[in-house]
Amino acid sequence: MDETKVVMEPVTGVEDPGGDKDGVLKLKDGTSCTLGRQDKRFSVWLRILSGAQKSGMPVYVACAPGGAAQTILPMAARTIEQVGGVGTTAERTAVQIFMAPSIHFLTARHAALRPLLEEAVKTQEPLLLAVEPGTLEILGARKPPEGLDVTPI
């Protein structure tokens, strides 16, 4: 069974043919995803992708097995202060982000990110995070691409 492909890469191209045709997103690693024009998020995605392409920042993209984009989120540089502690439960690990008013969370389905987050606590180097806005769940994390100057928010 095919699974959703998740990529966190810089944008190399966004094609918007206009009319009622779907757009196409191209990422640095060669991934291409269809941007469904009928999707109510289409115009928001175009703005996110345009800004990311200009800045060189990676984006978080989840594509269905057929290649259609399901989720596109901007990534932001953040400094991780603590992994675990207050707010941690059996289902999710609390993550304290510098200057964030709320606790963020890492769930079991993204547990593989924990070592990267813990390393960032030790080094105090910023990570690029993709966060689900409604739940504050950390969906993706990576180190900034080589040569990209990032300022944590």
Indicate residue ranges for each PLM-predicted region.
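Short, flexible, surface-exposed loop segments at domain boundaries
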Residues: M1-I153
